Amino acid sequence: MPRPDRLWLVLFAGVLAVSVGGCKSHSKAKVGPSMAPVYSVRDPDSVRRQVRWQDLLALAARDMQVGNLDAAERKVREAQKLAPDAPDGLVLLAGIDERRGRIQQAGENFRRAAELAPQRGDILNNYGAWLCQQGQPAESLIWFDRALQAPGYATAAEAQANAGGCALDAGQFERAERDLRAALATLPGNPVALEAMAQLSFRRGQFLEARAFAERRIAAAPATRSVLQLASQIEARLGDRAASDRYLQRIRQEFPQEAGS
């Protein structure tokens, strides 16, 4: 299945839109510059705290995107003082922990966020994706199932794509195909689902179908080393040595530091 770095793109994307309950005028915090809110003297303290919390997480997510982990962590921890049990802050903190190599702390924060938000499909999907990255694909499926059952989950196809890829890792081929095809029915260009379907078809010896999915994957998003390697293997099995070599040449050109790994 797609390696963890590609799953993380899906996982991190879900963190950048922070849902805020109980404050309709500030329903989402988005990454990017933001103006300081103007408060009325009649604003209750709880509203000011909530808006401050939201702004801190937006700024932290922006810092995290550009790799400024120290600043991101400071802002998230300040936000957590305002709302210690807010799952969105815990997810961002988990992402920072993961990037810093603090794997145990990352897992604890992802799990705590999921337990605090059992009806938030995005939070549940995040924890499932993290478990799969850590080599626990069977356990991850439990959390993907919960995400898919969450009411009002707007990006369920992403959880289906993750679930399908992780089911493939767990050796559950029938479930993998079911979830991946469901994801592609909604998001035909989902790169996680396309690459996983290429891998599934390859494992089943369906090399023409694997080629079709690999080509769709490469057209849908920037190529990664793993998908180029898979495409090369598919072409080799189909007897097209020239095409196989072209993919290997792309690896050498586009991923020179990884070409020999």
Predicted regions and their residues:
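TPR alpha-solenoid repeat register
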Residues: 89, 123, 156-159, 193, ...
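Terminal, low-structured helical/coil segments at or just beyond the last alpha-helical repeat
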Residues: 27-44, 217-261
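N-terminal leader/linker segments that initiate helical-solenoid repeat arrays
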Residues: 22-77, 81-82
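Canonical tetratricopeptide repeat
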Residues: 58, 92-95, 126, 160-162, ...
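Structural marker of alpha-solenoid helical repeat scaffolds
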Residues: 48, 82, 116-117, 150-152, ...
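Canonical positions in the second alpha-helix
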Residues: 78-79, 112-113, 146-149, 182-183, ...
